[in-house]
Structure formats: structure tokens, C-alpha cells
């Protein structure tokens, strides 16, 4: 065998050996990674992912319900407008018919009485007094005819306008009914979708170990509800937040406060928002419930709505609606009681309580908690009500 052939064979064998050991090394690394991966972490991550999807659907469902309520109100208003316009049309037609009868009578009298032109009276009058009488009668008849014709014309115009208004309101009522039907169908679809997602989330929750469930169910420390700093914005911005538009937890407690807990001022500057925060903090430990808005269980926007209700402020049960109501607030100017919304679709909400903390109802299996405000995901915006 020639030298170059032996060299070529040896090179092929060497390449094969290197490829084998390289493949073995990579496979061993992947296997080791799989062996070292914590199944518990995978289960929790999957639960969080599924719960997040269910929360998005829940808040979209709330928004769809608000949209349906608005469309139904528009439909009721359109139906009422249609009824009013039809009543006005009937009245206009009745008035027109009345004047039509009067005009017909005047026309008949004129026809039966002959010509009413002044020159005819002059030419046919047999005496000055008869001329005066005829001219007087002609003036009265002409005035009556002119008045009746003017009223007849006005009634006709009114009837035409009433008919046009009735036609428009009928079209508006049909459009409102169609829009309401479309929104109702969308709402029903989201309701069905949510029920499936809830079943999947609960199934994933069952897969957790008892220890994991216990850890999730721990509400953590309950802040005192004695007082809240009326203005305690975070001292720094979280990573990735634009300057002046995204806070992070403060590092030092306000004067008079416990370390790690917001300070609450009993009365005065906080106003209604103090009552909002106090109400929300009384629910720390309450369970998460899809669509919940009462102490038996809350979803994120349900907790916000309920807490504000306790202060006499009515808010919608929808994080997306909360993200667009009230007054916008820069994150550097946050005050306790401001509403925070999260993610690009504003599908999560919580209540800022000061010192970089917020109270919220986050997800299934996790009770209402106080957490750092930047721990729930990217902040969408902040609103003050």
C-alpha cells in the first residue's frame, strides 16, 4: 500500500474518532443537564405560563363584558330614539292630515264661490256697498287660505323630517343590535376559552408537590394598615425602564415605618387613596379567583375594583380599562393608591402602597400579596383615580 493511501486512511479514522468523542461529549452534557434540571422548577414554570395565559384571557373577558354593556346601552338608546321618532312621525302625519282637510275646504269654497280677484269684484259690483262687501270677503278668504296653506306646508315639512329621523334611528338601532350581537359572540368565545384554560391550570397545579403548594399559598408578611406615606415614590428605576418612567423599590423605609413595610399616615394627606390601600391590605392572604371581586376571592382587577369601592370610588372590573382611566402618572411621581398595570396588553393590575411596593392578586394558587412593584412583569402605565 502506498504511503499516501495509508496516510489518507489514518486521517479518516482520526476524524471519525474525533467526531465520535465530540458527539459523546455533547450528548453527555445534554443528558447531564436533563438529569440536573429540577422537575419542580419545570412544573412551577409551566404553572406560571398557563396562569399568565388564563389571566390574559380573564382580563380580555372583562373588557369584552364592558364593551358589551356599552353596546347594549347604545342599542337601548337607539331603540328609544326610534320609538320617540316614530311617535313624532305619527303626530306630524296627523297634523298634516288636519291641515289637508282645512286646505281642501278652502279650495272647495273658493271653487264654489267663483273667482276672488279684486278686479272681478269691481267689474261685477252693482253698487259701491256691494263692492266694499265683496272686497272684504275676498280679503278674509285670501288671508284664511294663505294661513292654511302656510300651516299645511310647515306640517308637510315636519312630517318629512320626522320620517327621515325615524328611518335613521331605525338604521342606528339595527347597527347597534348587530354590534351587540358581535360583541356577545366574542364574549361567549372568551368565556369558553377561559374555562378550558382554567381546567389546564388546575391540572398543572395538582402536579405540584405539597411543599410547592404550601410555598405558593404563603402570603408573606402582612404590612400594617395603620398608615401610608402620602408620597413615597421609589428611589431608583428598575433595569430597562426609561428615565423618569419606571420605578424600583426604595432601599430605605420612610420615617416612622417598619423596615420593608410602607409607613401609613393615619389621616390627612392620603385622602380616599389611604382608605383604598388600607382596604386592599386587609385582603392579604385572600385566595385568587378568576373573575373574583369580593373577599372570598379576587382576580387582579377585581381586587383593585373592590378596594376602591370601599373608598366610595367606582372603577371598572378590567385591567385594560383601568390602564386608560383616571389621570396618567409618571412612575417617578407615584403615590400610595395609584393603580399600576403590567404587560403590553395591560392584562395585570395592582395597587401601589409606597416604598416601591404594591399589593395585588397575582395568579391561581397564590393569595393576595405585597410584592416589589417591578416583580410582576413590565409596567404598562400608572393611573391615579
UniProtKB/Swiss-Prot annotation:
Gene Ontology CC terms, in alphabetical order: extracellular region; peptidoglycan-based cell wall
UniProt record, GO biological process: cell wall organization or biogenesis; proteolysis
Biased composition (Pro residues): 235-257
Residues at the active site: 300, 348, 360
Listed PROSITE patterns: NLPC_P60
EC number assigned by the record: 3.4.-.-
Calcium recorded as keyword: no
InterPro entries on file: NLP_P60_dom, Papain-like_cys_pep_sf, PG_Endopeptidase_C40
GO molecular function, one term: N-acetylmuramoyl-L-alanine amidase activity
Keywords: Hydrolase, Protease, Thiol protease
Top EC category: hydrolase
Start and end residues of each NlpC/P60 domain: 270-385
UniProt family annotation: Belongs to the peptidase C40 family.
Descriptive protein name: Probable endopeptidase Rv2190c
Species assigned in the record: Mycobacterium tuberculosis (strain ATCC 25618 / H37Rv)
High-level lineage: Bacteria, Bacillati, Actinomycetota, Actinomycetes, Mycobacteriales
